[in-house]
Structures are given as C-alpha cells and as structure tokens.
C-alpha cells in the first residue's frame, strides 16, 4: 500500500512540475515567434528593402513563414513524439528555436530572414509539443485545468511578444534582441532537459498500433474536435487582419488607430488568459462537451454586435468577452481528444488538432 501511494505521489509531483516547465517554455518560445512584428519593417529596411510595397510583402512572408511550417509539421512531430517520447521533441524544439532565433540576428538579406523563419517553424513546435505532453501526462480528471494553465501561458506569450519587440530594439538594437531571445530559449532548453520527466508507457503490440493508424478507427469525437478546432481558429483569427482598418473608422489618426487596434487584440488574449484555467477546471467537473457547446454559442452571439459598434471601447468590451469564451474552448477540445485517444497515438491525434 505504501509503495503504491508513493508512486502516485511521485507521479503527481512530476505532472505538476512538467506543467509549469511547459507553460514557461511555451511562453518564452511564443514571445520569440511574435516579438519581431513591431520592428520587422525596420529590420527589412536595414537589410536593403527600400520600397514600401516590398517591405509590406516581405513582412507578410517573413512573419507568416514560421506559423506555416509549424502548422504543417505539427502532425509529424506528434507522431514522432508518440514513438520516441514527448520530452525528446521538446528538447529538439527548444534547441532548434534557440539556434534559429540567434541566426536571425545575423541575417544580411531578406531571403535569409524568411529562410530562418521557415526553419524556426520547422524545428520549433514547443507549444504544441507541450500541449501533447501535458495532456498525456496529466491525470484525466485534471486535464481541462492543466491545459487551461498552459493555454494561458501561450496567450500571454502572444501578448508579450509584440510588447517586448517594441521595447528591446530601442534599448539594445534589433540584432542584439534576436541574440538575447535565443539565449532565453536556450535556458528553456536546459530546463526542459533537466527538469522535465516523462512517464513513458510501454508500447502496444504492432497489430494494435496498425489498427489505430486506420482513419476508420479514429473515434468520431476526435474527428469532431478536429473540425471544431479548425472552425474555432478561423472564427477567432479571420477578423484580426482587418481590425486595424475597422478601428480606423472611429479615429482620424492612423497612428492612434494602430495603438487602439493593439488594445482590441490584447483584450481578446487577456480574456482568454483569465478564463482558460477557470473554465478548464469547470469543464473537468461538469463535462467538456457541455462547456464547449455553450462557449461556441456565446462566441457566435458576441460576433454579431461587433459589426454594429459605434465606439472603440464597445469593441474592446465585446472582444474581451469573446476572449473569455474562447479561452475555455481549447482546453475542452484537447481534453476530449485526450480522453478518446490511445496511449500510443495521443501525440498524433493532438498534432492534427
């Protein structure tokens, strides 16, 4: 009895420690992926891009490159995580991001910056890998809460990235900012290497694994969550590129509109940060399907009045409330997939989500 209790206590300590390491690691790597947004046009200009249209083109390509390759390779890393271990994938991602970010500060041409951004997305994936590890290592009754905490770290990184990128280059220069960011991510690599402990489960027989690989064997709830996750991202992100233009209709100053648009976007992320752990814990108690369904309805209702606001503060309030609803959905989607996934294909199924 004592030995069994000791094993349970040890596992309890490990999953909580893993959660905080993954949350801090996701926070720092998301900062790295988003911090160049404020100074990207200036950096491209220093690399020899002169025309305004060319700067806009290169900015869009360079910024989106990381997220494109990260999305395309997430299922692959999820599959490899199931086979070789989730901790190993996080070590790979943090070390790869540290190297790529440091090299970005040494770029001498726009194409080099784009190539390094592509490389960062290809070698990265720390946040998605953390989601897989936390979801698979956390007790099922705590999955919603744990994923909510991790989601808050991801959202906080998305907010802090542009803020850091707006401050540090003025203090130390753009190239030094990249080098400092690479050094911070290297610390994340060390924390992942020495502090993270994965509780590996013995693999299933080959016949069972082969059955799990067939599309027909994938549980229907998992397929529904894939579609729900795609629609969730589409609904929440599709309007963000035009928020600045929308806000500009309420203020004559374009510079002022940019600041206000940043506040509007931050309001959504702030709402998600505040709501994710609380709604995740609530979903663990009352049911993930119930909370997810309610959140989808609330988001749909909150989207409609955003088209009819007459002042920026109204849009801020609506986007904040929408962030509260959105913050609880990702933990629910992840928890539902986790509950229906086998021990050896959790990473693959979460990677597709």
Regions from the language model: what does each represent?
Residues 116-154, 335-336, 340:
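Cytoplasmic helix-loop-helix junction between adjacent transmembrane helices
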Residues 39-56, 242-259:
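Short amphipathic helix-loop junctions that connect adjacent transmembrane helices
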Residues 177-194:
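Symmetry-related core transmembrane helices of the 12-TM Major Facilitator Superfamily/SLC fold
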Residues 61-77, 266-278:
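Central cavity-lining transmembrane alpha-helices of secondary-active solute carriers
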Residues 2-16, 197-227:
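Juxtamembrane intracellular "pre-TM" segments in multi-pass secondary transporters
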